[in-house]
């Protein structure tokens, strides 16, 4: 039997403690979401009550059904659009624009990543309102697409820098135009960055609260995150319903990570974030 050194044993203890501390809020949310209102008041947050009740989940889902559908619609479309546009922009910068201009253009586009969203809220609301897209799902799609392009462009550009220029030059010699080079040469090599960028964008857009609360009112286009923040009673907070709602809203991103997690790791290790 292999002996464990005292240093390694101590490291394991620390890691187990940190993992338990990290998972404690999730466990608290699960236990609270399976209690009645009276049980929430009479027990500690980490205490599990048997038998559990699932009435809070039914109540939370009834309240969140429309906002979750709204979030699924605009998150899916904004993720697709921003990822595709970022890929095309990344190909253009990395393979069509050469030299210093390429790096300068990438730096200019990447500036949008560091621009605080709060600083552009007033002009954003005015623009969206003037287009007749306030409180519309299309307005959220356009907003998240526009503000996703800088990060998707950066990720794709750094990946495309790693693809040998000889492949592009060979395609040009064969008479391929830029679009054919992109679709026939670059795109088949882009599975890794598409998975990484798609998961990143979907998670960020799904979890966004700021744009949702500023650009919507009522439930016609309200995202799930905004409705979740309002999921409380008039005078008393229904913690069991709120915790059930939080777990329901977290479910889509969790399922995506479970389904595509192995591709995400492959994307990282294959250089999707290199550069």
Swiss-Prot record:
**UniProt keyword annotations, A-Z:** Cell membrane, Membrane, Transmembrane, Transmembrane helix, Transport
Report one GO cellular component: plasma membrane
Q: Does the keyword Cytoplasm apply?
A: no
Question: What domain of life does the native source organism fall in?
Answer: Archaea
Note the InterPro entries from the entry: MetI-like (IPR000515), MetI-like_sf (IPR035906)
**Where does the record say this protein resides?**
Cell membrane
Q: How does it sit in the membrane?
A: Multi-pass membrane protein
Q: Gene3D superfamilies of this UniProt entry?
A: MetI-like
Membrane-spanning intervals of the chain: 10-30, 73-93, 105-125, 137-157, 181-203, 241-261
According to the entry, every stretch annotated as the ABC transmembrane type-1 domain falls at: 68-260
Pfam families registered for this protein in UniProt = BPD_transp_1
Q: Name one GO biological process term.
A: transmembrane transport
Please report which protein family the annotation says this sequence is part of: Belongs to the binding-protein-dependent transport system permease family. MalFG subfamily.
Report the protein's function. Answer: Probably part of a binding-protein-dependent transport system PH1214/15/16. Probably responsible for the translocation of the substrate across the membrane.
Report the protein name in the record: Probable ABC transporter permease protein PH1216
């Amino acid at each position: 039997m292999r002996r464990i050194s005292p240093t390694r044993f101590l490291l394991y203890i620390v890691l187990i403690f940190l993992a338990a501390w990290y998972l404690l809020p999730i466990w608290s949310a699960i236990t609270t979401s399976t209690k009645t209102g009276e049980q929430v008041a009479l027990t500690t947050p980490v205490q599990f009550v048997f038998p559990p009740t699932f009435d809070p989940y039914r109540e939370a889902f009834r309240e969140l059904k429309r906002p979750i559908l709204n979030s699924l619609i605009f998150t899916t479309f904004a993720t697709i659009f921003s990822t595709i546009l970022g890929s095309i922009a990344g190909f253009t910068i990395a393979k069509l624009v050469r030299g210093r201009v390429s790096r300068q253009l990438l730096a200019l586009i990447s500036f949008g990543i560091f621009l605080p969203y709060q600083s552009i809220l007033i002009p954003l609301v005015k623009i969206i309102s003037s287009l007749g897209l306030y409180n519309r799902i299309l307005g959220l799609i356009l907003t998240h697409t526009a503000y996703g392009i800088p990060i998707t462009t950066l990720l794709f550009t750094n990946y495309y820098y790693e693809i040998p220029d000889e492949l592009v030059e060979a395609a040009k010699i064969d008479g391929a135009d830029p679009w054919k080079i992109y679709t026939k040469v670059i795109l088949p090599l882009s599975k890794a960055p598409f998975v990484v960028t798609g998961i990143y964008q979907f998670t960020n857009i799904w979890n966004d609260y700021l744009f949702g609360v500023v650009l919507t009112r009522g439930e016609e286009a309200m995202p799930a995150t905004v409705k979740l923040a309002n999921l409380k009673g008039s005078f008393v907070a229904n913690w069991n319903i709120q915790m059930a709602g939080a777990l329901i809203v977290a479910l889509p991103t969790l399922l995506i990570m479970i389904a595509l997690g192995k591709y995400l790791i492959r994307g990282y290790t294959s250089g999707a974030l290199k550069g």
